[in-house]
Amino acid sequence: MYKPVDPHSRMQSTYSYGMRGGAYPPRYFYPFPVPPLLYQVELSVGGQQFNGKGKMRPPVKHDAPARALRTLQSEPLPERLEVNGREAEEENLNKSEISQVFEIALKRNLPVNFEVARESGPPHMKNFVTRVSVGEFVGEGEGKSKKISKKNAARAVLEQLRRLPPLPAVERVKPRIKKKSQPTCKTAPDYGQGMNPISRLAQIQQAKKEKEPEYMLLTERGLPRRREFVMQVKVGHHTAEGVGTNKKVAKRNAAENMLEILGFKVPQAQPAKPALKSEEKTPVKKPGDGRKVTFFEPSPGDENGTSNKDEEFRMPYLSHQQLPAGILPMVPEVAQAVGVSQGHHTKDFTRAAPNPAKATVTAMIARELLYGGTSPTAETILKSNISSGHVPHGPRTRPSEQLYYLSRAQGFQVEYKDFPKNNKNECVSLINCSSQPPLVSHGIGKDVESCHDMAALNILKLLSELDQQSTEMPRTGNGPVSACGRC
């Protein structure tokens, strides 16, 4: 530590140069002699002090360390003393007392707690007392700020912690070193099958602890667009060459040739892709290739049978993704549950041959009822049919009445099934019509009558298009026709 000492002060004259002494001051003045200016520096090393003197400050700073070096070089090295049964650790000057307290507490697994015990004094000159507890040890410190009081408290408790006996030496458990499995012998002839020959050759040389292979380009030959490169590889006293359309392929071929020379198995080389595209050749089909396709031509006697099969698949495909709550798509199982298969249908829903003339008449009656509310065609049919009973005449405004009138004229049944109200407080009804083909629809409304009217209107629209099914509707599997959506 350097400590500058004040230099010798100059001796000043007591003579005043002012004009107060008289109008004519003396012409000559002889001041007292002034000694030369000296600087002194004090250097502390351990418990010893060394002084340096000089006329200028920089040389004095160098003089004090020089004297300290001359003195300390002749002294023997100090022995390391043991304090409390342990070697004294070198004190770190950059480490504060608070850090030392936390370090000791961490080693001994002790809790540390700092708290301000009390404050005193006026607001502009407060005095703080901080208490620190480290396990069972307690210390207090006082200061003009919380930081100073905390530091003094740590200093007080640090003296108590240093008196503790040393920690017992804990024997460290030696970690078990897991034996590594014996690595694959990279020098075996079968090692590296399918690996890049360049990497394989390098790994083999590393396993042998020999020098890695050296590659060198020998020549380039051929036309600019048909270049051929010749690469040479050297492993020890063995050399091999490889040719390729580019340097990478040539290097690979050279490595493969070197592996063959060294006695390693090399897979068969695959043909490289040509630089220029060749003309595509039409593949020649061998007998027996492909799938067999059989064509059937209907005979005149089978026309009725084929028409029946076609009619079984004539059915509009309507998505049931927008069905309301409680309505299921009309799959065969659901159709059996609601009774669609009763009547003219069997259990497997094989449909009887429909009558095109009857479908045309049904569509005509449905259109007349939709547009006019009355149907002269239905009235004529009902008059000719004695078993139909008395049917009231006049226009019919409700779709449910129109559908009932049509069912009486064409001889099919209409059945409604009501469901409980949904989460929107709406009624839902399902209608089942045993026409050809059977039709199923649903209706939604505020009451049951409006649900029946909506469902009947959907069925009437489908019936009015029966004569157009053969040309407009796609063919799907057997089953009843379902009409979805709100009208």
UniProtKB/Swiss-Prot annotation:
Main location: cytoplasm
Region (Disordered): 175-196, 270-310
Biased composition (Basic and acidic residues): 276-294
Keyword ATP-binding: no
Modified residues (Omega-N-methylarginine): 27
Localization per record: Cytoplasm; Rough endoplasmic reticulum
Keywords in alphabetical order: Cytoplasm, Endoplasmic reticulum, Methylation, Repeat, RNA-binding
PANTHER family per the UniProt record, alphabetical: DOUBLE-STRANDED RNA-BINDING PROTEIN STAUFEN HOMOLOG 1 (PTHR46054:SF2), MATERNAL EFFECT PROTEIN STAUFEN (PTHR46054)
Protein name according to UniProt: Double-stranded RNA-binding protein Staufen homolog 1
Species classification: Eukaryota, Metazoa, Chordata, Craniata, Vertebrata
Gene label: Stau1
